[in-house]
From Swiss-Prot:
Residues that hold Mn(2+) according to the record: 201, 220, 257
Entry similarity comment: Belongs to the phosphoenolpyruvate carboxykinase (ATP) family.
Organism: Azorhizobium caulinodans (strain ATCC 43989 / DSM 5975 / JCM 20966 / LMG 6465 / NBRC 14845 / NCIMB 13405 / ORS 571)
Taxonomic lineage from the root: Bacteria, Pseudomonadati, Pseudomonadota, Alphaproteobacteria, Hyphomicrobiales
Signal peptide: none
Gene3D superfamilies reported for this sequence: 3.90.228.20, Phosphoenolpyruvate Carboxykinase, domain 1, Phosphoenolpyruvate Carboxykinase, domain 2
Pathway per the UniProt entry: Carbohydrate biosynthesis; gluconeogenesis
Name the UniProt record assigns to this protein: Phosphoenolpyruvate carboxykinase (ATP)
């Protein structure tokens, strides 16, 4: 077996059970991985230096093909209503079949960390079949210093083999695609998907399982900090604006997707950003645009001009879920440590497909827990396989696919931290205004940024507020720089009766969805539910 690169001499492939490999490339750097990816025909070089790869049939995550091993340890800890399960025996068969499938292959291995806080991180070793996948995960997680590698000991091992096809009858799974998570043995097996995001979300899933037991809140959120160190968290599903809104030139970026909150502050789980690039423009998102075509960036399913190799970010012919993965330090004002103090503001982002929610609302602590547990948004086109048009959905904790434990575990942690640190909470609609999806328009990003600036600098707290008659939260009556009517959703609709009916429909959906949580929350949170306060027109 041929081995190249640097690793701990006592932590080779045999510690995971791999055998008869043709070779392993350990902890290769960006130029080395570029050379392998291009030589193997996995990817092409874009004009500005990015590495462009296509993922084939899987252009998003496959949440229905993710299974957690149900054993004596996880039986009482995992939220089985939300997580598919396989037996330890089925996992062992799958594991042995993965090892057999790897024989004769040359793999790429990266020794990395999930978590910027040494007290709460996990050492994740990732074996990949593709060189560009190795570059992706090296970009997205946090790297040890080169001199640390000889002493590195993995605590979690991921093996990513897109060529592996699962057998539903043999392995107890749904299709030939598989993401198998074993919390007890600390292993993740990924097969038959080339979508690189599966790897990073597998590390996130592990941290979401492990950290609550330590009193640390894992969060599907972006985070940034003002010049005075005031931290803001942005919760939201993919496509709701976490990456875009946290990349603010006036604030220091901690990260765009995954963070932890301990008693010492907030820390990023990752070392990179994974930005949606469909219709990305230099004018609207200059920092992300600049980061998305330079050496070290991976472009996923982005079309390149046939002759010039210039990326066409307007071309969604492969998928609407085009992506750019780049190191955090490609953003000029990114935090070098990925760590900061406790939050001052929490922003819950929703892409309201019905177009009836205001662009911003202030939440009480009880309302914040209610909306966190509800996780209302829209599935935005292409983020998951099979989703082309936005559709209303409730994803608890703004990240149900990645939350192994019951939502109340995360909700109670969040409520306690909000109360302890007196955090201001806001709901921001980055979705539709002037009508539902297909009729109205997407909320202008300049409106959202103006409102966010007012919330984060404290000036919005001095505004006059009114109570929304449908949802009960507080909405500013006027904000400098914002056209007044946009703060009143009903005034943006041509048909007021249609607005009323649509708002009532959404209120009913909220209440129906929350019924499953009512036994897990106190009276204050139950009373924070939307209640229509006006008679039908």
């Amino acid at each position: 077996m041929i081995e190249t690169g640097l690793r701990n001499s006592s932590q080779g492939i045999e510690t995971f059970g791999l055998r008869n490999l043709a070779g392993v490339h350990w902890n290769l750097t960006e130029p080395q991985l570029y050379e392998h990816a291009i030589a193997k025909g996995e990817a092409r070089l874009a004009a500005g230096g990015a590495l462009a790869a296509n993922t084939g049939v899987h252009t998003g995550r496959s949440p229905k093909d993710k299974f957690v091993v149900r054993d004596a340890t996880t039986e009482g800890e995992v939220w089985w209503d939300n997580n598919g399960s396989i037996t330890p025996e089925q996992f062992e068969t799958l594991y042995q079949d993965f090892l057999a499938a790897a024989e004769g292959k040359t793999l790429f291995a990266q020794d990395l960390y999930g978590g910027a806080d040494p007290a709460h991180r996990i050492a994740a070793r990732v074996y990949t079949e593709y060189a560009w996948h190795s570059l992706f995960i090296r970009t997205m997680l946090r790297r040890p210093a080169r001199e640390e590698l000889p002493g590195y000991v993995p605590e979690l091992t991921i093996i990513d083999l897109p060529s592996f096809k699962a057998d539903p009858a043999r392995h107890g799974v749904r299709s030939d695609t598989i993401i198998a998570v074993n919390f007890t043995r600390r292993i993740v097996l990924i097969g038959s998907s080339s979508y690189a995001g599966e790897m990073k979300k597998s590390v996130f899933t592990f941290l979401n399982y492990l950290l609550p037991a330590k009193g640390v809140m894992p969060m599907h959120c972006s985070a940034n900090a003002g010049k005075d160190g005031d931290v803001a968290l942005f919760f939201g599903l993919s496509g709701t604006g976490k990456t875009t809104l946290s990349a603010d030139p006036a604030r220091t970026l901690l990260g765009d997707d995954e963070h932890g909150w301990s008693n010492t502050g907030v820390f990023n789980f990752e070392g990179g950003c994974y930005a949606k690039t469909i219709r990305l423009s230099k004018e609207a998102e200059p920092e992300i645009f600049a980061a998305s075509d330079r050496f070290g960036t991976i472009l996923e399913n982005v079309i390149l001009h046939e002759d010039t190799r210039v990326p066409d970010f307007d071309d969604g012919s492969l998928t609407e879920n085009t992506r750019s993965a780049y190191p955090l330090d490609f953003i000029p004002n990114a935090s070098p440590t990925g760590r900061a103090g406790v939050p001052k503001n929490i922003i819950m982002l929703t892409a309201d497909a019905f177009g009836v929610m205001p662009p911003i609302a202030r939440l009480t602590p009880a309302q914040a827990m209610y909306h966190f547990l509800s996780g209302y948004t829209a599935k935005v086109a292409g983020t998951e396989k099979g989703v082309k048009d936005p559709e209303a959905t409730f994803s608890t904790c703004f990240g149900a696919p990645f939350m192994p434990r019951h939502p109340s575990v995360y909700g109670n942690l969040l409520r306690d931290l909000i109360a302890k640190y007196q955090v201001d909470c806001w709901l921001v609609n980055t979705g539709w205004t002037g009508g539902k999806y297909g009729v109205g328009r997407r909320m202008p990003i300049k409106v959202t940024r103006t409102l966010l600036t007012a919330a984060l600098d404290g000036s919005l707290k001095d505004a006059a507020f009114r109570t929304d008659p449908y949802f009960g939260f507080s909405v500013p009556s006027s904000v400098p720089g914002i056209e007044p009517h946009i703060l009143y959703p009903s005034k943006t609709w041509a048909d007021k009766a249609d607005f009323d009916a649509t708002a009532r429909k959404l209120v009913a959906m909220f209440r129906d969805n929350f019924a499953k949580f009512e036994g897990h929350v106190d009276a204050a949170v139950r009373d924070a539910q939307p209640q229509v306060r006006i008679a039908a027109e």
